[in-house]
Amino acid sequence: MMVGTQNLGGSLPPLNSPKSYGITKPLSLAGPSSADIKRNVELEKYLVDEGLYESKDDTMRREEVLGRIDQIVKHWVKQLTQQRGYTDQMVEDANAVIFTFGSYRLGVHGPGADIDTLCVGPSYVNREEDFFIILHDILAEMEEVTELHPVPDAHVPVMKFKFQGIPIDLLYASISLLVVPQDLDISSSSVLCEVDEPTVRSLNGCRVADQILKLVPNFEHFRTTLRCLKYWAKKRGVYSNVTGFLGGVNWALLVARVCQLYPNAIPSMLVSRFFRVYTQWRWPNPVMLCAIEEDELGFPVWDRRKNHRDRYHLMPIITPAYPCMNSSYNVSQSTLRVMTEQFQFGNNILQEIELNKQHWSSLFEQYMFFEAYKNYLQVDIVAADAEDLLAWKGWVESRFRQLTLKIERDTNGMLMCHPQPNEYVDTARQFLHCAFFMGLQRAEGVGGQECQQFDIRGTVDEFRQEVNMYMFWKPGMDVFVSHVRRRQLPPFVFPNGYRRPRQSRHQNLPGGKSGEDGSVSHSGSVVERHAKRKNDSEMMDVRPEKPEKRASLSPQSLDIVSPENSAITTGWTPPVCNLRRPPSEEIEADNLNTECTELTDLARNECNSGSEQVLEVDSMAVVQECSDPAEPLGKCVTPDSVDVVACVSGQEENLDRNLRSVSISGTDSPLLPSRSCGQNRDYEGFGFPAANSDPMGKKNLYSQSGMSEDLQSNSLVSGMEKSEDRARSESFQKSQIRLLT
């Protein structure tokens, strides 16, 4: 499907349209200006040039594949009906129906995208045996089917495969009917009668997609805007539900809400309003397209007033179909911070675009993840063969989010983790391998004791133990977690196998930097006062008495933490680079006009401007924070060369390195207690304080719009249009590193 500009004129609804969308009145009924239309043409041309639309031939191939899958499941159900002794009439009437959902159903899929598909079958055809065993075997024997991978234990059980090269995610729902009609109305609540919760989740993918299209004023404008923002999210590294960011349905719901608030806006306007709204949204107030409805069927719906677990959701985005659920329960404190920064980045770029100071390409600039941090966790995944690696990687990736949550939990939210959704493969290695990475940074604006240490050896052990409990584990499957310094990152994570010349990190920060004249510098521009940047000054101190790798052990829990010294530690890892964090940051709320008060109070993050961080490693990593930059350092020690053990495919490889170190303290510091291994807790059980999980308090515990209750009126219209967002100013502090034995 291609896009053009022919719909800009006649497709807009009338300005005084009587139909209302959403749970609040629109923020603006304004239509596009001539400048908006011009920018919209440029945006759509950019999306086409970027190859985001598939050809007509590819569209026809997808339709043919869906027709073929429909034939297969119909034959499968008839075969089972006959084998189970039903009458000839029942065999003749036996039926299964295929529905699509996700990006394909919403019309925003691109070339090579998978097709989210749901098979609805009769009550006597079950998921556990009939779908995941019998249908699986039928598909496995077909030449058209490749990379068949069942995931029966997923939150939404799914069978993944490629059919004639097109990726398919096939779900199954057995409803309480002996015969499934071909014209089944899946949006009716009656399909949910007498089904289990996995079936409800499977059915709701289609039900949510249909509801979204019904709840937006103009679905063509919605589709273009969503296609644009999904592409932006992938470029900025925040498109992944499994790692704690947002997936396709989350982005669709966020875009749909903006379409409701600006019903007459075209895509170029909606993209701008998207960033304007969500940089000012008061999380954890929920985003909802319609009111949450109860039903006599009795399924639990999202309601933080009644459900204790719902109060710990940080970024609730509620699905519009019964039973209404939070589609973004995976979001953690760390990933919410990253997404908030990226929203600010997008908002600043859009302000520049509207002033004709930037082009659309600036919005979609790739986020340089491997230049953003000094510390990274590397998670290496290995398996015996390609099929095992596919299954093992999917399992480890699904648990990767838990590592983020556990680190937040065990450091009381003082260490933030930025998981990178993309996987990386070292093609130079002969064994089957892939790797994921996570950036590490001390949380901004958190209080803490001087030189505090955080022990996460037990955290890493706990993560590895949970991962190794994989139900379908096979010999050869293994996972390794290690710290790497930025300049020790493996070459295969960089384009063409080599890192590009170092640039000022201000070019990669979301939101750019504010100069003295008030102008904002984005990627591609350099703030003069930060133009000169020192090279990495971190040094390392290695003592040679323990050259070999050893398994990490969880430290004993301590009830008292020293006010002078404490740290962060991970187990059996190579040396880790120093962590850097921005100093004090303050985002002021935008002042609206006199007709209304603030749209929202933006969070103020206060932190020590002179903080300095150090990592210490003894087959472990230790992050140390000192608030006084003038604190005297210990003397520099230059040891002899020593063997540092690196993990390669489960084997040890000795690497001779000459390392130096600057020590911050002459004595070992007590460690913050770590959680013992073997605990398997949900995010809701991590014990975050209510102040962190629900900072808005009772007053805003359940606000329908996410905005201040006194602002839910038409007086917001002019205020939103006149708001001026300010970019946050960040700088980076020096940090040191040392190795302990």
Swiss-Prot record:
Tissue and organ distribution: Mostly expressed in flowers (very active in pollen, sepals, styles, and stigmas), cotyledons and hypocotyls, and, to a lower extent, in roots (confined to the vascular tissue in the radicle) and leaves (in the vascular tissue and leaf petioles). Barely detected in stems. Active in the primary and secondary root systems.
Record has Nucleus as a keyword: yes
Record site: Interaction with RNA: K160, N330, R401, K406, E598
Names of required cofactors: Mg(2+); Mn(2+)
Protein localization: Nucleus
Binding, Mg(2+) 2: D114, D116, D169
Any Pfam family: PAP_RNA-bind
Subunit description: Monomer. Forms a complex with cleavage and polyadenylation specificity factor (CPSF) subunits CFIS2, FIPS3, PAPS1, PABN1, PABN2, PABN3 and FIPS5.
UniProt name for this protein: Nuclear poly(A) polymerase 4
Native source species: Arabidopsis thaliana (Mouse-ear cress)
Name of the gene encoding the protein in the UniProt record: PAPS4
